[in-house]
Amino acid sequence: MALTRLLIKDFRNIESADLALAAGFNFLVGPNGSGKTSVLEAVYTLGHGRAFRSLQAGRVIRHECAEFVLHGRVDANEREASVGLSKSRQGDTKVRIDGTDGHKVAELAQMLPMQLITPEGFTLLNGGPKFRRAFLDWGCFHNEPGFFTAWSNLKRLLKQRNAALRQVSRYTQIRAWDQEIIPLAERISEWRAAYSDAIAADISATCALFLPEFALSFFFQRGWDKESDYGELLARQFERDRALTYTAVGPHKADFRIRADGTPVEDLLSRGQLKLLMCALRLAQGEFLTRQSGRRCLYLLDDFASELDTGRRRLLAERLKATQAQVFVSAVSAEQVADMVGEKGKMFRVEHGKIEVQPQD
């Protein structure tokens, strides 16, 4: 799975760009504010329908332009496909696949599985549970065909239930929602638990390579007491939920906790160690997908050198090379990525939103 070509129009500070990409490493080098992260963000947006630095379309559309347009050619298991995404300032989104309109962003996400490693990505480890749920849900989305529909339906039903909690006085008035919510909640929790169990060995092995000085452990918490029946719990906690005006337990409260030597990682590890752990988690997840489905992720690394010394950069570079996946890396200077440059790599110089191929020695 790789992008062979990327066209960018009116995205962030990039007016227009047409990039022929390497199947291996693609390096984006330039000073801070040059637009190199914008290229990474364009790749991410093409596969997710939204940017990773802003959820508001207006903030990623170039100044005084009506919309941004992204287009890519995808080499997917010896089959080439065309994908396109545009979004207006009003938030209107258009997805095109192989020349036809009317497609969903979820289809792009299936075609372009990506792992994102950014300075903001520490939220996976020290942020709220929603970031770790997203980690599990990425895996479930790519491994369980019914997950996306089930999770979308559950979120819709929970939103309706929460709205109803503000208006009802008896549990019988809300039972109809619970009868639909309960089977979805249990199925989603089972998928998440199965995925966390299945990927545990991959995570442990990769973490042992990156952080051998720690004994790491992982725990999936489904969002309600494991000894309790979810349906009975919803009925029992109705008065509490009504007072809170939201549903306090369920898959939307699940978490995936990580400990080092018995201590939460965010309380023990340094910034550099947390970045290595984040890289290990993303790599393990991508490699697990490849082994299960034969599909390779795209890896996006922003500000690669920050928090990592030379030895750790080299370790990460070697592991990324071993995946044989397509990798996009941003850095301030070519020297920072010297250990990663190889015969399958391509260097791009980015300045003021202009992108040029830079010859390699």
UniProtKB/Swiss-Prot annotation:
Presence of the UniProt keyword DNA repair in the record:
yes
- Superkingdom of this entry's organism? Bacteria
Q: Which GO terms describe its cellular component?
A: cytoplasm
The reply on keyword Disulfide bond is no
Q: What is its main location?
A: cytoplasm
> Where is this gene product found?
Cytoplasm
Question: Which Gene3D superfamilies does its entry note?
Answer: P-loop containing nucleotide triphosphate hydrolases (3.40.50.300), RecF/RecN/SMC, N-terminal domain (1.20.1050.90)
Per the UniProt record, one Pfam family is SMC_N
Q: Which residues cross the membrane?
A: none
Please provide, alphabetically and separated by semicolons, the GO molecular function terms listed in this UniProt record.
ATP binding; single-stranded DNA binding
> What are the binding positions for ATP in this chain?
30-37
UniProt keyword list:
ATP-binding, Cytoplasm, DNA damage, DNA repair, DNA replication, DNA-binding, Nucleotide-binding, SOS response
Q: Which PROSITE patterns match?
A: RECF_1, RECF_2
The record's annotation in InterPro entries points to: DNA-binding_RecF, DNA-binding_RecF_CS, P-loop_NTPase, RecF/RecN/SMC_N, RecF_2
A GO biological process held by the record:
DNA synthesis involved in DNA repair
| HAMAP family in alphabetical order | RecF
- Outline what the protein does: The RecF protein is involved in DNA metabolism; it is required for DNA replication and normal SOS inducibility. RecF binds preferentially to single-stranded, linear DNA. It also seems to bind ATP.
- Family under the similarity heading: Belongs to the RecF family.
Checking PANTHER family in the record gives: DNA REPLICATION AND REPAIR PROTEIN RECF
> What's the protein name?
DNA replication and repair protein RecF
Species: Yersinia pseudotuberculosis serotype IB (strain PB1/+)
Q: Which gene encodes it?
A: recF
